[in-house]
């Protein structure tokens, strides 16, 4: 018996992507393969640019990159380094009052006291090198004439236990100046809120000129991450990004296992990165793909009224367009919704808005 023509037309309009005649569990790769086929059928293959011919390896310019300014994998990561110059705090110069008399007396003894206040930013970083510039007022001939068993310059740091020696080495410096490079063991001193240095120079005099003010130069870099932060940074990213729709999908109350055996609308969060098209389809980054899945048994749908006691239930027959045909869980004709996407074929210099029709299922039934 040949079915009427309207029934045949309606049968042809039923989407073939319902996945309803599969088993109780549907493999994710099967759904992804179906989604790829639907996109390629609607949009065609992505444009091939470059010698490689792989649209997945094209990179968007930084101004078009989604999710912030991501670094390219081929570029080395730039190290976070900085340089800071510290001048002595007030009261550490010869012209300051009332400390002028005390400093002049110390200068006669060849001892100069300077107080530095490292910033909070510097204290939060790792100091890699530091050197103190001090105006000695001595030319090279005077320095050579003062050579003796006692060193010309010595550096002390004031601590809770009293002054302690700071290991330093003399570096190259212009005339009338001395550069003292702090040893690595003394670098943690610059991570304290207050640093008091005592410089011993028997032949030096205290100068009140602004251009003779000593200063401290420090080079810093970001501290290496701790064990917990390193673990979090090394954790590989999720294969697909989170979205509000995916979060709502996870927050749904759990369903009975039997409900998944019957015909129902299933959902799957799919990202274009997972499909290998994140450089072709740039928006949205992910979407919830709804499809029909499950068997078409004779159990009553959950929205039907409960049976009356002592009254035999009436068997529920599934909707079938063709008499004698096996019903299949599929989307109702006319209820499919499209998906709007934004694509690029030149690495992000131009965009195209396209529509994938009949992609998202709204209602499922046994047909």
Swiss-Prot record:
Residues 1-20 form the signal peptide. Dimeric, linked by one or more disulfide bonds. Activin B is a dimer of alpha and beta-B. Inhibin A is a dimer of alpha and beta-A. Inhibin B is a dimer of alpha and beta-B. Interacts with TGFBR3L; this interaction regulates female fertility. Disulfide bonds join 263-329, 292-364, 296-366. It comes from Equus caballus (Horse). GO terms for molecular function: cytokine activity; growth factor activity; hormone activity. Residues 21-63, 64-233 form a propeptide. It is found in: Secreted. This is Inhibin alpha chain.
């Amino acid at each position: 018996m040949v079915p009427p023509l309207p029934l045949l037309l309606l049968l042809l309009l039923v989407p073939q992507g319902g996945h309803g005649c599969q088993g109780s569990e549907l493999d994710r790769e099967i759904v992804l393969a179906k989604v790829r086929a639907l996109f390629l059928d609607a949009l065609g293959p992505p444009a091939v640019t470059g010698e490689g011919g792989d649209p997945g390896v094209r990179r968007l310019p930084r101004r078009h990159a989604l999710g912030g300014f991501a670094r390219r994998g081929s570029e080395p990561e730039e190290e976070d380094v900085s340089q800071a110059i510290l001048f002595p705090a007030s009261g550490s110069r010869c012209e300051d009052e009332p400390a002028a008399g005390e400093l002049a007396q110390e200068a006669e003894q060849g001892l100069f006291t300077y107080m530095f206040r490292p910033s909070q930013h510097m204290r939060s970083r790792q100091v890699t090198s530091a050197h103190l510039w001090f105006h000695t007022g001595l030319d090279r001939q005077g320095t050579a004439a003062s050579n003796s068993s006692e060193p010309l310059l010595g550096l002390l740091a004031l601590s809770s236990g009293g002054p302690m020696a700071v290991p330093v080495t003399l570096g190259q410096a212009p005339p009338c100046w001395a550069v003292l490079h702090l040893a690595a063991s003394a670098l943690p001193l610059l991570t304290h809120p207050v640093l008091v240095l005592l410089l011993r120079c028997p032949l030096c005099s205290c100068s009140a000129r602004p251009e003779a003010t000593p200063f401290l130069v420090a080079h810093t870099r970001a501290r290496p991450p701790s064990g917990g932060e390193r673990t979090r940074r090394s954790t590989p990213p999720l294969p697909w990004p989170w979205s509000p729709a995916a979060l709502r999908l996870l927050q749904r109350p759990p369903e009975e296992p039997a409900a998944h055996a019957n015909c129902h609308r299933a959902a799957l969060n799919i990202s274009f990165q997972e499909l290998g098209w994140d450089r072709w389809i740039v928006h949205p980054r992910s979407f919830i793909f709804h499809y029909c899945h499950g068997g078409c048994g004779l159990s009553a749908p959950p929205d039907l009224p409960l049976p009356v006691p002592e009254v035999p239930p009436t068997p529920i027959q599934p909707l079938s367009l063709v008499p004698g045909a096996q019903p299949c869980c599929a989307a109702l004709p006319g209820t499919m919704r499209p998906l709007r996407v934004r694509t690029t074929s030149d690495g992000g210099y131009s965009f195209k808005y396209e529509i994938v029709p009949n992609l998202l299922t709204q209602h499922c039934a046994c047909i």
